[in-house]
Amino acid sequence: MKYSFVSLLQRGSIGSKQFIFFAKNEMSPLKAGVPGAKFLKYTVGFTLGTLAGFYLTNSRSAIHEYVSCPTVRLLTPDAEAGHKLGIWLLKYGLAPRLWFDKDEELLHVNVFGKTLTNPVGCAAGLDKDGEAIDGIFAGGFGYVEIGSVTPLPQPGNPKPRFFRLPMDEAVINRYGFNSSGHDSVVKNLQNRVSRFINSYFCNDINAVDNLSLYQNKLLGINLGKNKNGDEVQDYLKGVEKFQKYADVLVINVSSPNTPGLRGLQKESILTNLLSQVVAKRDSLVSSGNVLGAKTHRPPVLVKVAPDLEEEEIKAIAEAAKKSKVDGIIVSNTTIQRPASLITEDKNLVAQAGGLSGKPLKPLSLKALKTMAHYTKGSGLVLVGCGGISSGADAIEFAKAGATMVELYTCYAYRGPGLIARVKDEITEQLKRENKTWSQIIGEDVK
């Protein structure tokens, strides 16, 4: 009598020779009528599909750095088109995410009365209009900053205005505060909060007290001024509009692409501006926030340039202390073109605009060290930004005085896996030194 493969298995009487026979003959994928073959085919297909799906959606997968990102750059020779494509993918949840994102405790950091799960943030400029906040957080960031946002919609500077320097892992931009304006960004934020409240994940809105809508993560909103706007009133309008949506408010006075903006960094002008911003923020505390809190007092940070002499940095430190802001982001892009640039196209290098990416690191780190010296003991929180592309870079900034760090350009070049890699590298080095992130902040400040 001839038994089927399944019946032999059920009888427990299949030997090695019989198994090989059935594997070669009865379970051949060509025999579509055999139930065992169909089951095996579907099982293998489902398993392979699941594994492929996990691999492709996991930001740690090497394919994103070595295939996906280079392919996007190849398909979008216009750098701004590539930027827009990236935001579109993040907005609709099509970008890879960091699966099993649980940060080790030694990465936790207390800042502004909150505990962040990790100190790695996304700098402003990636998501200018608050369209892709959740997609960015899904990459593993502890802090995401959107903007800059201007009161009225404005197109920014004429195109082309965004240029890649891939050999240097750098970009030059002269966007000029292109923004959809306050009302449009508020609508994006309102829709996001509404989706959160109505989702089945939100059983108790009071369980989340951060406006990022994530426990132990913060959302910053970077405020700018219109090209022909008032240098004080535009920022006050931003505070009034976004106070109830932001965990952190950032005053951007350092973009090189808005005429006269960097002039706001002069001590007397900056002290006046920041003092009025803080006063406006304090006047709105009792207005609460969109999550129903009765009071809300988001910290105010000011973002400054790296192209400053020591006396200018000292003056900014004094302005920050006098105005009682909560911190300083060091730094924005640079108008310098460092000698270290290896891009051979001199016309490309000579494009007007701010340079960001790896070549910015020496300038931003130097500015941070100087700022840390002049703010030591003041309680001001320093955020390091500019050219950070590794865990070693992040630790260098922390030891120079940064409580948190931000990155953007290298994230665009290396892909979504960079965030996990940076956190892994920080963790490994901290373990070697037998320290936590909090313990190394300002370690080298003199």
From Swiss-Prot:
InterPro entries: Aldolase_TIM, DHO_dehydrogenase, Dihydroorotate_DH_2, Dihydroorotate_DH_cat, Dihydroorotate_DH_CS. It is found in: Mitochondrion inner membrane. One of its GO terms (cellular component) is mitochondrial inner membrane. It is an enzyme of class 1 (oxidoreductase). Its cofactor is FMN. It comes from the Eukaryota. The chain crosses the membrane at residues 42-58. Its EC number is 1.3.5.2. The keyword Membrane applies. Binds 1 FMN per subunit. Pathway: Pyrimidine metabolism; UMP biosynthesis via de novo pathway; orotate from (S)-dihydroorotate (quinone route): step 1/1. Gene3D superfamilies: Aldolase class I (3.20.20.70). GO terms for molecular function: dihydroorotate dehydrogenase (quinone) activity. Substrate binds at K128, N173, R174, Y175, G176, F177, N252, V253, S254, S255, P256, N257, N332, T333. Keywords: Flavoprotein, FMN, Membrane, Mitochondrion, Mitochondrion inner membrane, Oxidoreductase, Pyrimidine biosynthesis, Transit peptide, Transmembrane, Transmembrane helix. It is a single-pass membrane protein. The keyword Mitochondrion applies. It catalyses: (S)-dihydroorotate + a quinone = orotate + a quinol. CDD domains: DHOD_2_like. The active site is at S255 (nucleophile). FMN binds at A124, G125, L126, D127, K128, S148, N222, N252, K303, S331, G357, G387, Y408, T409. One of its GO terms (biological process) is 'de novo' UMP biosynthetic process. Catalyzes the conversion of dihydroorotate to orotate with quinone as electron acceptor. Belongs to the dihydroorotate dehydrogenase family. Type 2 subfamily. PANTHER family: DIHYDROOROTATE DEHYDROGENASE (QUINONE), MITOCHONDRIAL, DIHYDROOROTATE DEHYDROGENASE (QUINONE), MITOCHONDRIAL-RELATED. This is Dihydroorotate dehydrogenase (quinone), mitochondrial. It comes from Kluyveromyces marxianus (Yeast).
